[in-house]
Each structure stands twice: as C-alpha cells, then as structure tokens.
Amino acid sequence: MPNIKSAKKRVRVTRKKTLRNKHVKTMVKTAIKKFELALQNEDVETAREELKNATKTIDKAVSKGVIHKNNAARKKSRLTAKFNNIAS
C-alpha cells in the first residue's frame, strides 16, 4: 500500500481506468463472439450485421485508447477475411 499521497491517487485512478478498459474489451470480445456464432450457423445476413457491429465496437475501443489501432486493424482484417470465406 502506497504511503505518498500522489501514489495513493495513482492507485485510485488506475483502478478506475482498469474497470473502464475491462468493460470496453469485454464488449469487443462479445461482439466478435456473436459474429463467429453467426458464421458457424452459416447465416450470411446475420453475419454481415454482426461484422458491422464488431467493426464499430472495435473502432470505439480504439478511439477510447483501450486497444492500439494496429491491433484493431488486424482484428477487423481477420474478421472480414472469415466473412469473405463464408460469403463466397
């Protein structure tokens, strides 16, 4: 446990930011899982909609600084490639 006042504040701030970041990351993972479930069911229209939602969620995470833009680009690229395999 920190003794210095600024260190105590850093612990509080870090705890708050960790919770916020965890929430956003969970939303991204959930969106990706929904998309992959639609792919498994081979429902192209639902998969297209879930891909759109997943991409939107990933972009929001980037804008909030939770994930790096290159990480987001890689995730979106892989999801799009999976969709294109099933759609064609």
UniProtKB/Swiss-Prot annotation:
<dbReference type="GO" id="GO:0015935">
    <property type="term" value="C:small ribosomal subunit"/>
</dbReference>
<comment type="function">
    <text>Binds directly to 16S ribosomal RNA.</text>
</comment>
<dbReference type="GO" id="GO:0003735">
    <property type="term" value="F:structural constituent of ribosome"/>
</dbReference>
<dbReference type="Pfam" id="PF01649">
    <property type="entry name" value="Ribosomal_S20p"/>
</dbReference>
<keyword id="KW-0694">RNA-binding</keyword>
<dbReference type="GO" id="GO:0005829">
    <property type="term" value="C:cytosol"/>
</dbReference>
<dbReference type="GO" id="GO:0070181">
    <property type="term" value="F:small ribosomal subunit rRNA binding"/>
</dbReference>
<comment type="similarity">
    <text>Belongs to the bacterial ribosomal protein bS20 family.</text>
</comment>
<keyword id="KW-0699">rRNA-binding</keyword>
<keyword id="KW-0689">Ribosomal protein</keyword>
<dbReference type="InterPro" id="IPR002583">
    <property type="entry name" value="Ribosomal_bS20"/>
</dbReference>
<dbReference type="InterPro" id="IPR036510">
    <property type="entry name" value="Ribosomal_bS20_sf"/>
</dbReference>
<dbReference type="GO" id="GO:0006412">
    <property type="term" value="P:translation"/>
</dbReference>
<protein>
    <recommendedName>
        <fullName>Small ribosomal subunit protein bS20</fullName>
    </recommendedName>
</protein>
<keyword id="KW-0687">Ribonucleoprotein</keyword>
